[in-house]
Regions:
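A conserved beta-strand/loop capping segment in the N-terminal third of enzymes
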Residues: 1-11, 17-72, 131-136
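Active-site/ligand-binding neighborhood in enzyme catalytic cores
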Residues: 44-51, 58-186, 190, 195-197
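Conserved beta-strand termini and adjacent loop/short-helix elements that scaffold enzyme active sites
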Residues: 38-40, 170-172, 242, 308
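C-terminal segments that line or cap access tunnels to active or ligand-binding sites in enzymes
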Residues: 184, 195-334
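Conserved beta-strand segments of alpha/beta enzyme cores
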Residues: 9, 34, 166-168, 304
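A short acidic, glycine-rich active-site loop
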Residues: 12-16, 147-148, 211-214
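Aromatic-acidic/polar surface patches that form glycan- and anion
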Residues: 17-18, 84, 147-154, 228-229, ...
């Protein structure tokens, strides 16, 4: 969801960069918007030093002064050998076993602990199955074939998707359940699956986010769309400067003079979750996975209701994956 503020498209719920390798998904979204060529190349700030993300040869050169892939690989393998971890018992040990101590302590530890609200030694190892390490000089965060930002913003793209469709807002499904059920052959429910069943087995857990957005009287605040802050002592995980998603360009001639002298930035803070907050990330530990299985068994018995999306299926979805899931579901139902 984006809002146009003085010609700058502001990502209200944090940075969203569209990326996919699915041609079907790319062709689908391009029916509703033209995409720019934005490439996500975040940087990480740790104790006043900037490092390129994801971990690549530019990162390794900054960390150790190495210039060749062989030197970088040798350095990482040396640190992994020194750690001597064969069976990681927690996230910290898992990360060190994958990339060594230097990368972990500077670029993984603090960020991850802020993200989850727990010490890395208290987090299960399975949270990090792998850490992408590239032995090339390439700062493109994603490996996908297609990438970009919809020109005019995501809100405009969704408006185009919904053209000709009746949409009712601010309607609570549970307050109007009988009415909605009576007029539809199928119900697509994208809310929390545990709420649908009145939390009969207990509540699923989530992590939330909160955002602080400010306007500065400068045309360029940080020189990049996304800067990660990996020190634990800094409470936010990243700062987003929205105009860089569209290369500093403004929307409409009337906005050019305004946006040239101002910029809008958002600080992103990980947050605990309760029912009054937005659920952003599922917490897929053993307890929640078992709980979801119970709700899924109930959902599988439904003849009319389909549970979709992050909340309905209790899983993390990138934008392209949830669109592909929706298209596949439509193929099955229609």
């Amino acid at each position: 969801y984006t809002e146009n503020v003085d010609g700058i498209n502001v990502h209200i719920y944090g940075a969203h960069i569209f990326h996919t390798s699915e041609k079907r998904v790319w062709d689908y979204v391009n029916q509703f918007a033209e995409f720019n060529r934005y490439t996500n190349s975040p940087v990480a700030l740790y104790k006043g030093e900037l490092y390129n993300m994801p971990f690549n040869m530019n990162t390794f050169n900054k960390l150790w002064g190495v210039t060749t892939p062989a030197e970088a690989l040798a350095k990482i393998e040396e640190e992994k050998k020194e750690a001597g971890i064969t069976e990681p018992k927690n996230l910290e040990e898992q990360a060190i076993s994958l990339v060594g101590k230097t990368i972990y302590e500077k670029l993984v530890k603090g960020y991850t602990e802020k993200q989850w609200g727990k010490k890395a030694t208290e987090l299960p190892s399975f949270i990090i199955k792998r850490l992408p390490v590239r032995f090339i000089y390439d700062n493109n965060y994603f490996n996908d074939l297609y990438q970009g930002i919809p020109m005019g913003g995501y809100t405009k793209m969704v408006e185009n998707m919904l053209e000709g469709t009746e949409v009712k807002l601010n309607c609570d499904y549970f307050d109007n359940k009988e009415e909605f059920d009576s007029i539809a052959d199928k119900i697509i429910f994208t809310g929390p699956i545990d709420k649908y069943y009145d939390y009969c087995y207990g509540e699923l857990e989530y992590r939330s986010l909160r955002f602080e957005t400010e306007t500065y009287p400068v045309d360029n605040y940080q020189g990049n769309a996304v800067v990660n802050y990996t020190e634990y002592e800094i409470p936010y995980t990243r700062i987003i400067e929205h105009k860089h998603f569209e290369f500093g360009k403004t929307l409409g001639k009337e906005a050019e003079g305004i946006a040239a002298t101002k910029t809008i930035v958002t600080r992103e803070y990980p947050d605990s979750w309760n029912k009054e907050k937005e659920p952003y990330y599922t917490v897929n530990n053993e307890r929640n996975s078992e709980l979801y299985k119970k709700y899924k068994e109930l959902a599988d018995k439904e003849g009319k209701v389909l549970f979709c999306g992050r909340l309905g299926q209790y899983c993390y979805y990138d934008m392209d994956k949830v669109i592909l899931s929706a298209l596949n579901t439509a193929d099955e139902v229609l």
